[in-house]
């Protein structure tokens, strides 16, 4: 089993589209509309200024991470980042590898900190890996996430200096 992370371009988004579509359609972790189409998804993931990376397991894209300045100008030294891992390969440590890569890459790109703007309170796996990697909850957004389009749950803002 070989796992490799490479920088990606928007024209390769189709490689991770099935992963994105499955995660977003579940309505449990990302705020994108559950019926997001391919072109909308590409625009979200490859937002202006974003650097995007795909994780390949034995040559197949199974994960992705973006890193983007959280705000422009005087706050551009803080980045925002997100990651998606294919459900079929979860539990193999790939999320940890994507986290380690993201922390190192954000620092290499010159960012001083990472702010995660919306971590859903019901996303235990994400919260656990973030806490294990030095992120702290710095704010709670009551009822900020419409979980599965059925009920409102809290979301957190997480922060970590690099």
Task: Pin down the residues of each PLM region.
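Acetyl-CoA-dependent GNAT
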Residues: 33-88, 99-100, 161-162
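Short hydrophobic/aromatic beta-strand or adjacent loop that forms the aromatic wall/cage
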Residues: 50, 153-157
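Conserved acetyl-CoA-binding loop-helix of GNAT-fold acetyltransferases
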Residues: 91-106, 128-132
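Conserved catalytic-core motifs of GNAT/GCN5-like acyltransferases
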Residues: 115-119, 131, 136-151
